[in-house]
Amino acid sequence: MANSVAELRRRIEGRFDGEIGFCRLERGELTIEVPREFYFAVCKALRDEENFGFEQLIDLCGVDYMEYGLSDWETKKATVDGFSRAVERRQYKKQAWTRSRFAVVVHLLSVRHNWRLRVRTFVDEEILVAPSVIQLWASVNWFEREAFDLFGILFEGHPDLRRILTDYGFIGHPFRKDFPLSGNVEMRYDPEQQRVIYEPVSIEPRVLVPRVIRDDHRYQIKASGDEGGHG
């Protein structure tokens, strides 16, 4: 079948040998990984060359791989129930993520060939800059602004890289995994100043893992002296 995903994979591997990190087919979905320096050129070829014809960009997002691959919570071992109940530790190993923390992922659509393709590129954690592809697909405008707003990824060449979901005075990037759930500041209307003001957040940050795992005594046999009512 000429327009099968396997055919797309064959064409990509033949055309971009040396320019892509991998081309992986899983669950019927094709993903390619492109080094940052080849990202724009590969995307341009995917759009313009007849063998590919990806005329539409349908999505772009940022990804934070902080703590990716950790197999368990950093907490005490569960007792009767919990995350680690009935798990044999030899079944898996804890895998530490050693690559860059942030990535940009785009999803492309070729209507003429009925293909979908996922393209991923990692950005330097210290610089956080990726080439903008707005010259190739105008639809990426707000997507790149969203990735900048939520993850702090800068897109070189974007003509209007401003926050799009948070307000102008927002501090930080809320989709980063180390961003506090309670935020950094809270705002309220000050009747004396007759305007909205920002103040340091006054609530305690939530903890996502149990602080204490207590022993479960519900199914333990009671001692004989504990039975017999209340006297």
From Swiss-Prot:
- Name of the protein this chain belongs to: NADH-quinone oxidoreductase subunit C
Determine if RNA-binding is one of this entry's keywords. Answer: no
> Catalysed reaction per UniProt?
a quinone + NADH + 5 H(+)(in) = a quinol + NAD(+) + 4 H(+)(out)
Q: Where in the cell is it found?
A: Cell inner membrane
Q: Which EC numbers does the record give?
A: 7.1.1.-
Q: What does this protein do?
A: NDH-1 shuttles electrons from NADH, via FMN and iron-sulfur (Fe-S) centers, to quinones in the respiratory chain. The immediate electron acceptor for the enzyme in this species is believed to be ubiquinone. Couples the redox reaction to proton translocation (for every two electrons transferred, four hydrogen ions are translocated across the cytoplasmic membrane), and thus conserves the redox energy in a proton gradient.
Q: How does it assemble?
A: NDH-1 is composed of 14 different subunits. Subunits NuoB, C, D, E, F, and G constitute the peripheral sector of the complex.
Say which domain of life the source belongs to.
Bacteria
Which GO terms label this protein's molecular function in UniProt? NADH dehydrogenase (ubiquinone) activity; NADH:ubiquinone reductase (non-electrogenic) activity; quinone binding
Among Pfam families, the record links this protein to:
Complex1_30kDa
Provide the species name. Nitrosococcus oceani (strain ATCC 19707 / BCRC 17464 / JCM 30415 / NCIMB 11848 / C-107)
Q: How does it sit in the membrane?
A: Peripheral membrane protein
* A cellular component annotation (GO) from this entry: plasma membrane
Q: Which PANTHER family match?
A: NADH DEHYDROGENASE [UBIQUINONE] IRON-SULFUR PROTEIN 3, MITOCHONDRIAL, NADH DEHYDROGENASE UBIQUINONE IRON-SULFUR PROTEIN 3
Q: Which keywords are on file for this protein?
A: Cell inner membrane, Cell membrane, Membrane, NAD, Quinone, Translocase, Transport, Ubiquinone
Its family? Belongs to the complex I 30 kDa subunit family.
Keyword Cell membrane part of the UniProt annotation: yes
Gene3D superfamilies associated with the record: NADH:ubiquinone oxidoreductase, 30kDa subunit
